Amino acid sequence: MNRHISEILEKYLGRIPSLTEYHTLKSQYKNIHRVNIFNKDIFISLIKKNKKKFFSDIDTSVSEIKKLVFDYFTKQEQTYSIGKLYTIIELQTILVTTYTDILGVLTTKGPDIFSSNVQYNTSSMQKIANDALNSMNIATISDKVMGRHNVSSLVCNVNSLMEEYLRRHNKSCICYGSYSLHLLNPEIKYGDIDILQTNSRTFLIDLAFLIKFITGYNVILLKVPYLKNYMVLKDQNDSHIIDSFNIRQETMQHIPKILIDNIYIVDPTIQLLSMLKMLSQIDRLEDLAKNPDKLTIRFATLLEYVRNKYGIILNGNSNNMPMPSTIDIKKRIITVDTKYYNFAYDKCYVYLDENSLSSDILSLNADDAVDFENVSNSAFLVNDKTLYTYFSNTILLSGNDKIHEISSRGISAHILIYQALMKYDISIPLTDIVNSLIGRNKQPIYEIIPRDKKTGKHGIIDIEKDIITH
């Protein structure tokens, strides 16, 4: 045995390590040493400041916080399972090496906020948005409750923290969804704050510990198999606190964004196209049927932003939007005629099964596919004047083998997202797709082609039970 390593392990475990413990944990001795020398008093001071600033309504005393912190940092002394020890070491290491820079810094004085005047009066867009959504309000209301609707009582506290986090870490974290639109239009209400970031796992682990030490709650992190690079933080009642998509720095650099009050939000043009794409998903149409007013103000805000930015004249002249498309139901591939626009391809093959797309890209022996992760939810490849991509939502049919206009528009929006992320000019097709929303009549749904079914196991990080599964 190496005496130095053995002493580090003994100090950490509060006992002389067994031969098994020594040989399995010696590779972790540097991380264990970091935990051993970690200044818990300074850490507790940061937790207290975070509590005062973001969780002041939580009734927890300083002595209770101290006990929770010291209990966790001595937990290994009562743990003999090697697997659990590895989990404790991994989580403690993340906490001692990242917490100060990620969450501790939020309690210090931040940079001055440069107030933005990017706010929109959407009154002129309300009727257009209302009429457009009314023409798409064709789903039957479902009684099922989606997981995203079960909201934790901690959401308001975490939202307050997230607003500061987005300002301090605006190079690595941006937001989209209702909060980002609230920044454009304060009339829009929001629930939790939707974020994309480059260090999602580390951030959520640090946040989980902050909540644990302030509330005593056993919060858990879940990784969902059918959503790539997605993690959600849930409280002890299995209610949603916050979720986050992790993206590469390269993807972050591709995303068009605007700065409002020191917070970067995904460019509302991308958000409008994503909404048009999302409306092809049947459960989103069910949400529309339940609460049309909620979506109308968001839709109107996005339309007003795009109208202003691109100087769009709203006259109902949609030209070739949605782009003509046909479906092969057996192969689950849609062919879109894109030749009417100045794209680098004349047609697009839209796959409804991601594995089929991946297989065909491999068979093409092409290595220049691009993947914008959760921003587009698909890889893209241009080969021989054809764009190959994947569409992750349901496809609505309005007749036998006839794609419903809602889905056809959603697919066209998906293609425009690719064009925008590649920094190509989309002003003409964007003008057409916006005008394709005007003067439409309701078309009933004839059939629903299901979305791609993802398989796999949920990953979990449970601090209380010392579990990490991938």
Swiss-Prot record:
It catalyses: RNA(n) + ATP = RNA(n)-3'-adenine ribonucleotide + diphosphate. Keywords: ATP-binding, mRNA processing, Nucleotide-binding, Transcription, Transferase. It comes from the Viruses. The active site is at 192, 194. GO terms for molecular function: ATP binding; poly(A) RNA polymerase activity. One of its GO terms (biological process) is mRNA processing. The keyword Nucleotide-binding applies. Heterodimer of a large (catalytic) subunit and a small (regulatory) subunit. Belongs to the poxviridae poly(A) polymerase catalytic subunit family. This is Poly(A) polymerase catalytic subunit. It comes from Deerpox virus (strain Mule deer/United States/W-848-83/1983). The gene is PAPL.
